[in-house]
Amino acid sequence: PQMMGIPLILIAIFLPTLLIYTSPTRLSTNRMTTLQLWLTNTITKQLFLPVNTPGHKWAAMLMTLMIXLLSMNLLGLLPYTFTPTTQLSMNMALAIPLWLATVLTGLRNQPTASLGHLLPEGTPTPLIPLLIIIETVSLFIRPLALGVRLTANLTAGHLLIQLISTAAFVLLPMMTLTALSTFIVLVLLTGLEIAVAMIQAYVFTLLLTLYL
């Protein structure tokens, strides 16, 4: 498949390389390297604001995860491509091990504080059993919420794009003006989906940092 004479397979192969930081071979950096450094530093600072210093060792892994999610989300908006992150199985395969790692790390390093989160301070005695059950359930629901949120947001956006593009294609021979207005809506929705793809990658990573 091609778009404006450009094979889409070339875009799918080379676009993610723009997000990967490569160490410059000389002292003066180019604009792309400067942009990569600025984005990496800005996002890392925002992600790790609520995390204490020992948790900063997760920075490299979580930034890699965010770039992987961002690449897959954006590449899924290209025609004739498939978005892996619209599959719940893949999102759960990412969410469950990372969530489990945060839980086990907390239990190993600060077992008392980790177990203390299951019972808020100042809880009335009659409510203690109920609150422990509620907090335990909410703890185990976290990976499901991560996976379902990412899947649902991307799937809903792709379905809307598919429906509106089909409507524009069907209306074109019958009502040209209506088809053109529908196409404008499609362009705006595509821009919104690009923003959603970026935001969802950021939110997925941000929630993992909050679980640390």
Swiss-Prot record:
The chain crosses the membrane at residues 3-23, 58-78, 87-107, 128-148, 169-189, 192-212. Its main location: mitochondrion. GO terms for molecular function: proton channel activity; proton-transporting ATP synthase activity, rotational mechanism. It holds the Pfam family ATP-synt_A. It catalyses: H(+)(in) = H(+)(out). The keyword Translocase does not apply. It is a multi-pass membrane protein. PROSITE patterns: ATPASE_A. GO terms for cellular component: mitochondrial inner membrane; proton-transporting ATP synthase complex. GO terms for biological process: proton motive force-driven ATP synthesis; proton transmembrane transport. The keyword Transport applies. It comes from the Eukaryota. Keywords: ATP synthesis, CF(0), Hydrogen ion transport, Ion transport, Membrane, Mitochondrion, Mitochondrion inner membrane, Transmembrane, Transmembrane helix, Transport. It is found in: Mitochondrion inner membrane. InterPro entries: ATP_synth_F0_asu, ATP_synth_F0_asu_AS, ATP_synth_F0_asu_bact/mt, F0_ATP_A_sf. Subunit a, of the mitochondrial membrane ATP synthase complex (F(1)F(0) ATP synthase or Complex V) that produces ATP from ADP in the presence of a proton gradient across the membrane which is generated by electron transport complexes of the respiratory chain. ATP synthase complex consist of a soluble F(1) head domain - the catalytic core - and a membrane F(1) domain - the membrane proton channel. These two domains are linked by a central stalk rotating inside the F(1) region and a stationary peripheral stalk. NCBIfam families: ATP_synt_6_or_A. Component of the ATP synthase complex composed at least of ATP5F1A/subunit alpha, ATP5F1B/subunit beta, ATP5MC1/subunit c (homooctomer), MT-ATP6/subunit a, MT-ATP8/subunit 8, ATP5ME/subunit e, ATP5MF/subunit f, ATP5MG/subunit g, ATP5MK/subunit k, ATP5MJ/subunit j, ATP5F1C/subunit gamma, ATP5F1D/subunit delta, ATP5F1E/subunit epsilon, ATP5PF/subunit F6, ATP5PB/subunit b, ATP5PD/subunit d, ATP5PO/subunit OSCP. Belongs to the ATPase A chain family. This is ATP synthase F(0) complex subunit a.
